């Protein structure tokens, strides 16, 4: 999870400027989520305050995520969906998002929901759209004209072709297709969106361990005793593992096997 999408500030609702707070970059692993929640120290009945402080490359989502009823786990899931997009797919997502916003506006004030955003993020990895290298109507019009998308231009001479109103052609095509420009790309949706699977509001179950070690004695000490130790471990668990192996010195042990949860 190297690519981070959001930076969030977590605290107790009602007293956000409290010493019990956490800052977290999303997407985060289950361990990171639970570690942040333990820093906030919510008591029974208390609610979580969450503020998105950094949108990285997705600042245009701020007006729509601000005030949206969304939990930490749901926001983390959205961040995970966005984090796997490459540069072109990110542009496609922004284009699909702009189209969806306009569709909602035309539908008399419909709001962008969390499910809308998740569907768009998933769809940005499908073939429901086309992306053309064009930063404005003139470049778009020339692309369509040069690639025979305008039948009326068939057979025109080079001299006449260069005199065409490419900006007008591009504008006409863009308006008829409801496409949008994103930076230096033109995004056109030409298929159905994919529905993202449901996501729960609550955090996943707290992982029981980060590392699971199978330990044995060094060959020099003989014996075939083994024990399993989950890390992080309490002092009691560490002492119990040593007792099982029959040694008080970790230098006398070897790791026979290592497994870990996804972090």
Regions found by a protein language model. Name each.
Residues 261-263:
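Conserved small/polar residues in nucleotide/adenosyl-binding loops
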Residues 34-82:
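An N-terminal, globular interaction/scaffold subdomain
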Residues 48, 252-259:
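N-terminal low-complexity, intrinsically disordered segments
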Residues 12, 141-225:
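Acidic, proline/glycine-rich low-complexity IDRs
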Residues 26, 68-74, 86, 110, ...:
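Intrinsic-disorder-associated interaction segments
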């Amino acid at each position: 999870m190297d690519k981070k999408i959001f930076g969030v500030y977590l605290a107790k609702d009602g007293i956000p400027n409290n010493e019990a707070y956490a800052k977290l970059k999303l997407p985060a692993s289950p361990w990171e989520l639970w570690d942040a929640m333990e820093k906030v120290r919510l008591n029974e009945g208390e609610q979580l305050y969450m503020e998105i402080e950094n949108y990285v490359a997705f600042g245009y989502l701020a007006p729509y995520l601000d005030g949206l009823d969304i939990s930490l786990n749901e926001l983390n899931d959205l961040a995970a969906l966005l984090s796997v997009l490459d540069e072109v797919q990110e542009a496609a997502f922004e284009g699909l998002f702009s189209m969806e916003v306009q569709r909602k506006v035309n539908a008399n004030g419909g709001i962008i929901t969390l499910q809308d955003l998740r569907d768009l993020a998933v769809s940005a990895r499908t073939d429901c759209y086309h992306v053309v290298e064009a930063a404005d109507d003139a470049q778009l019009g020339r692309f369509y004209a040069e690639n025979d998308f305008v039948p009326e231009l068939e057979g025109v001479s080079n001299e006449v072709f260069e005199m065409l109103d490419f900006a007008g052609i591009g504008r006409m095509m863009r308006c008829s297709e409801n496409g949008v420009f994103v930076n230096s790309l033109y995004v056109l949706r030409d298929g159905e969106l994919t529905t993202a699977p449901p996501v729960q509001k609550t955090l996943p179950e707290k992982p029981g361990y980060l590392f699971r070690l199978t330990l044995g004695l060094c060959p020099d000490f003989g014996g075939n005793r083994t024990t399993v130790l989950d890390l992080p471990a309490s002092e009691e668990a560490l002492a119990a593992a040593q007792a099982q192996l029959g040694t008080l010195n970790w230098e006398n042990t070897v790791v026979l096997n290592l497994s870990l949860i996804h972090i």
